[in-house]
Swiss-Prot record:
Function: Catalyzes the interconversion of ornithine to glutamate semialdehyde.
Protein EC: 2.6.1.13
Residues that bear N6-(pyridoxal phosphate)lysine: 256
Lineage: Bacteria, Bacillati, Bacillota, Bacilli, Bacillales
Name by which UniProt lists this protein: Ornithine aminotransferase
Length: 398
């Protein structure tokens, strides 16, 4: 017999570490953009597991790929080749235009991989003295929860009690080209940036920043690394958020929707002159590039292509953004976004509004305390989007 919502939450609170503060809802079933709790109540998902479910929950093609591959082989480790890794490599290489890839499992692992690659490149190729390489990042970034990722963060709460932090990191204001110029030295290995900052509240740098920052990095022989874990794969209305400024970074970091919301997989994409610094034994992952993840990822990318979800994100994102900007309420400070990646910033904490929306059957989550993030699966229909807009109007209109 299925447990009730209250029973599940009670048991979760009893045994689980308190490193999350979820809304009081239990999801036991999901399909497309709709989810259900144990009592059968339906909710429209406007979070998409932080953009990991761009293709919708339990997409039949992706689930079938999982089932088919699970009947054959799931894990070989990288001690042997597997027959799914090569087609995965080829698919992602064609998508990104990069000729060398390194697969991992989670986004944070891929960030770790990119930082390791940048540092070794700085020593082996650029000629930076040993142990003096520097990585430049932006204030309010979010690159994960591992030690490297929290060392990159400017959020003191993410760091509290976890020191000492990784050295060799400089933090500049997001979107500040002059600060980037001032931070670069002969020891700078890379500039790591989110083209749209998700956890910071869907922050978009001023127009031209990415292009100018990339050009600056090229002039100074600094790697430009784009963390597209959340903003990539159609979420922003383009394949990659960098595409809004026609920037092709030296390194892409991809994750989340790369696994179609079904299986974790991430990847660092660059060219041979960068990722070629790795040699056998210098980096690895038992599960990285496993056949199950690769088969799922190929299907996930095919769904984005075949169902034109990038184009849908662009069209419906513009529609949703326009509708949200029409809400006339003094508590709203700003409405911003690209594609189906939209933030409504308030003059007060957003949590209570997310809780009210939950009661209306719409699931979203506050970020950066005062921002409501709206990021539904890209498969959302116009009808369902209009239903969501109606609920948002009901909660946010004065």
């Amino acid at each position: 017999m299925q447990s009730s919502t209250s029973a599940v939450i009670e048991k979760t609170e009893k045994y689980g570490a308190k490193n999350y503060h979820p809304l009081p809802i239990v999801i036991s079933e999901a399909k497309g953009v709709w989810v259900k709790d144990p009592e059968g109540r339906k909710y429209l998902d406007m979070l998409s597991a932080y953009s990991a479910v761009n293709q919708g929950h339990c997409h039949p093609k992706i689930i079938q790929a999982l089932k088919d591959q699970a009947d054959k082989i799931t894990l070989t480790s990288r001690a042997f080749h597997n027959d799914q890794l090569a087609p995965f490599y080829e698919k992602v290489s064609k998508l990104t235009g990069k000729n060398m890839l390194l697969p991992m499992n989670t986004g944070a692992e891929a960030v770790e991989t990119a930082v390791k690659a940048a540092r070794r490149w700085a020593y082996d190729v650029k000629g930076v003295p040993d142990n003096q390489a520097e990585i430049i990042v932006c204030e309010d970034n979010f690159h994960g929860r591992t030690m490297t990722a929290v060392s990159l963060s400017s959020n003191d709460e993410y760091k509290r009690g976890f020191g000492p932090m990784l050295p060799g990191i400089k933090v500049i204001p997001y979107g500040d080209l002059e600060a980037l110029k001032a931070a670069i030295t002969s020891h700078t290995a890379a500039f790591l940036v989110e083209p749209i900052q998700g956890e910071a509240g869907i922050r978009i740098p001023q127009e031209g920043f990415l292009k100018e920052a990339y050009a600056l990095c090229k002039r100074e022989n600094v790697l430009f690394i784009a963390d597209e874990i959340q903003s990539g794969l159609g979420r922003s209305g383009k394949w990659f958020a960098c595409d809004w400024e026609d920037v092709k970074p030296d390194m892409y970091i991809l994750g989340k929707a790369l696994g179609g919301g079904v299986f974790p997989i991430s990847v660092v994409c660059a060219d041979r002159d960068i990722l070629g610094v790795f040699e056998p034994g210098s980096h690895g992952s038992t599960f990285g590039g496993n056949p199950l993840a690769c088969a799922v990822s190929i299907a996930a990318l095919e769904v984005l292509e075949e169902e034109k979800l990038v184009e849908r994100s662009y069209e419906y994102g513009n529609y949703l953004l326009t509708k949200l900007k029409e809400i006339d309420n003094p508590i709203i400070k700003d409405v911003r976004g690209r594609g189906l990646f939209i933030g409504v910033e308030l003059h007060e904490p957003a949590r209570k509004y997310c809780e009210q929306l939950k009661e209306e059957g719409l699931l979203c989550k506050e970020t950066h305390e005062t921002v409501i993030r709206f990021a539904p699966p890209l498969v959302i229909s116009k009808e369902d989007l209009d239903w969501a807009i109606e609920k948002i109007y009901y909660v946010l209109k004065p």
